[in-house]
Amino acid sequence: MIRFESPRRWLPTLTASVVLLAGCASQNIEQYAAERPQLDLAHYFNGKVIAHGIFQDRSGQVVRRFTVDMDGRWYGNQGVLDEHFTYSDGKKERRIWRLTKHADGRYTGTADDVVGTASGRAVGNAFQWAYTLNLPVDGKVYEVQFDDWMYLIDERVMLNRASMSKFGIRLGEVTLSFQKHTP
């Protein structure tokens, strides 16, 4: 004979599990389909763009400030985005993205410090981009995952929030404000 326990015993555990799992759910890019202006990454990153950003550790403390001077060039569905980072401590870095625009708003990209291929998709005014980055820290290099979300505010301004994690543990967050140079 099968014996069922009273819901009073297992319902609180089930409810807590559902709440915890819901907290792990991420945004869905499709929810931005009706948002305007429409983001065409190849158009936005064609030419000069400057960004100002911060990195916050998992407690929320700002531990790094930086600017990024970018120059993008597109030839058909192939693009190059040349990024020059300047940090508040004077350190400088450079990353060159080689990007490909695919059908349905999908993009892929590679860079020397990116492991494998980054992939993302633009829908409405939003773009979601995921990749693994080789991050140098105190003489060691760590592979960390980035979940990047960009939101086009108007033709010139775009905001970016990126969550950085390792082994699924959130390490911090990057926030950027992009401003497209218009002649």
Where are the regions a protein language model picked out?
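Bacterial N-terminal signal peptides that target proteins for export
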Residues: I2-L14
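C-terminal motif of bacterial Sec signal peptides marking the signal peptidase cleavage site
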Residues: L21-G23
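Bacterial signal peptide processing site
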Residues: A25-N28
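Sequence-level preference for short, compositionally simple segments enriched
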Residues: E30, V68, W74, D148, ...
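N-terminal helix-cap/turn-to-beta initiation motif at the start of protein domains
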Residues: Y32-K48
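Central antiparallel beta-sheet cores of small beta-barrel/beta-sandwich binding domains
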Residues: H52, Q56-V137
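Amphipathic hydrophobic-ligand
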Residues: V62-V68, V141-F146, R170-V174
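Glycine-rich, aromatic-bearing surface loops/beta-hairpins
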Residues: D147-P183
